Amino acid sequence: MKKVLVINGPNLNLLGIREKNIYGSVSYEDVLKSISRKAQELGFEVEFFQSNHEGEIIDKIHRAYFEKVDAIIINPGAYTHYSYAIHDAIKAVNIPTIEVHISNIHAREEFRHKSVIAPACTGQISGFGIKSYIIALYALKEILD
């Protein structure tokens, strides 16, 4: 069974609480349950990690290599726009990685339009609500099969 690591960055633990008009009203826990169900259907083992701290996210990406993780789905939150360190960590481990965003980052404030992480990733999915994670799972199924 292929193992997928889902990493969520800053403030994503507040899904269902923060800016419901942008991120929806589904709780973080319910998002994880939805991802788990779909991952199981697709034959993936899934592990979740959330941190509001850049260094912890980088450490987790490094550990993914040594733990033989097959793929990563990452929602870097605001780190999307300036974390060259997360970009470099993804490049370093050479694990298929998909960057996801709940909102369409290109339809929001100007500073959110650029991702410095996407160039290190296999692809980017943005703007489909929590379904962005599910779409990423389908993409990984194609990539890993």
Curated annotation (Swiss-Prot):
One term of GO molecular function: 3-dehydroquinate dehydratase activity
Listed HAMAP family: AroQ
EC number: 4.2.1.10
Key words of the record: Amino-acid biosynthesis, Aromatic amino acid biosynthesis, Lyase
Site (described: Transition state stabilizer): 18
Entry keyword Lyase: yes
Residues noted as binding substrate in the record, renumbered to the chain: 75, 81, 88, 102-103, 112
Catalytic activity: 3-dehydroquinate = 3-dehydroshikimate + H2O
Lipid metabolism as UniProt keyword: no
CDD domains on file: DHQase_II
Family note: Belongs to the type-II 3-dehydroquinase family.
This protein's pathway: Metabolic intermediate biosynthesis; chorismate biosynthesis; chorismate from D-erythrose 4-phosphate and phosphoenolpyruvate: step 3/7
InterPro entries in the record: DHquinase_II, DHquinase_II_CS, DHquinase_II_sf
Protein name: 3-dehydroquinate dehydratase
Top EC class of this enzyme: lyase
PROSITE patterns per the UniProt record, alphabetical: DEHYDROQUINASE_II (PS01029)
GO biological process, alphabetically ordered: amino acid biosynthetic process; aromatic amino acid family biosynthetic process; chorismate biosynthetic process; quinate catabolic process
Quaternary organization: Homododecamer.
Location of the active site: 23, 101
UniProt function note: Catalyzes a trans-dehydration via an enolate intermediate.
